[in-house]
Amino acid sequence: MIIKTKYHGETQIQEDQTIVFKNGLPGFTGEKKFVILPLSEDSPFVVLQSVQSEELAFIVASPFVFFKDYGFDLDETTVELLEIESAEDVEVMAILTIEEPFEKSTANLMAPIVVNRRKMLAKQVILHDSSYLTKQPIGGEAC
């Protein structure tokens, strides 16, 4: 199918590339289908693009690129919702806010996106009782 995207114009995607957020994203509960697209060839960043809304796209990256010791436990409800059977099925992404200069850019570590890559199910998880920030500076080490 062809979708309209924020950063790449019209783009051909396969149905099996679609990631389903059963409950939508916080603030975007009606948006349930997304696809991951490259931002550029050599970038650690990718685009989490809504299949339904052209303008709804987030720059995301693995938080481990910037924060090697990042970690959290998933609650049983999330494990069941995402049908996670193995840790190898899980990919974690952080939504980034890219600023100029890049050193001012931040990552939302308090609300990571957890994806079951085998089942193509995802959820943005809110880490209550966490010391992580919604605007954690990432610095320039991935440039």
From Swiss-Prot:
Organism for this UniProt entry: Bacillus licheniformis (strain ATCC 14580 / DSM 13 / JCM 2505 / CCUG 7422 / NBRC 12200 / NCIMB 9375 / NCTC 10341 / NRRL NRS-1264 / Gibson 46)
Any GO CC annotation of this UniProt entry: cytoplasm
Role this protein plays: Acts as an anti-CsrA protein, binds CsrA and prevents it from repressing translation of its target genes, one of which is flagellin. Binds to flagellin and participates in the assembly of the flagellum.
UniProt similarity note: Belongs to the FliW family.
Keywords tagged on the record: Bacterial flagellum biogenesis, Chaperone, Cytoplasm, Translation regulation
Pfam families the UniProt entry points to: FliW
Official protein name in the record: Flagellar assembly factor FliW
Assembly with partners or alone: Interacts with translational regulator CsrA and flagellin(s).
